[in-house]
Amino acid sequence: TAWPPTSLIMTQALRVLNQLLAPEIASGKVKIRIIEGMTFERRVELGESLPADVLAACKECNVLIKGPFTTPRAGDKFPDGTPMPNMVSANSLLRRSLDLFAAVRPIKIPEKNIDWCFFRENIEGEYIWGNKGIQVNDDLAIDFKVQTRQGSERIARAAFEYARKNGKHNVTAITKANIVKLADGNFLKAVHHIGETEYPD
């Protein structure tokens, strides 16, 4: 993030952290470190979506609280009309570099009897080569989706393990295997295999 933080999210996150961890911070047990260097302008200047010094600093920390990163969309332009570069998503690079393969999203709405937890594969699929597509001509573009058995089994295992530890007996795999026969089809096979062989309960 930039310092002082320009994002309301990071401003409030730091405020809450300083309140919650006040004793630990005062004793020196916990140190809050601000990692700078992720402004879009700097990344464009360096030609790096995730600068090496920023990644190295992230790897030195035990816990990361990340603010929003800006990744230009295809066709975005600078204020002067110059096209923005086709950059890999900094979020995707950070996930891959730190092996953050699972996006875990719990949702609880007791009055509607909703107690769900979503596990989304965070590294493979469309995320792995998001800027490596092929523009065949003005009328045709091709992008890639990559799914490995190992990646599919790992996210499935994480979801099943969470379910077991939290007393849940239903795990649902959501795919487009009816359309994306190979990548999503293989993902679905991997989920069923892990469920049947390792988590029959």
Task: Give the residues covered by each predicted segment.
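Glycine-rich phosphate/diphosphate-binding loop of Rossmann-like nucleotide-binding domains
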Residues: T1-R15, L20-L21, N137-D201
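Flexible loop/turn segments at secondary-structure boundaries
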Residues: P5-T6, F40-R42, P72-D76, V180-L182
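N-terminal beta-loop-helix "entrance" segment that forms/cooperates
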Residues: P23-A52
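Short, conserved catalytic or adaptor-binding loops enriched in Gly and charged residues
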Residues: E24, A57, L94, I194-E198
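Conserved beta-strand termini and adjacent loop/short-helix elements that scaffold enzyme active sites
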Residues: R33-G37, P106-I109, I174
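N-terminal glycine-rich phosphate/adenylate-binding segment common to multiple enzyme folds
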Residues: R42-I142
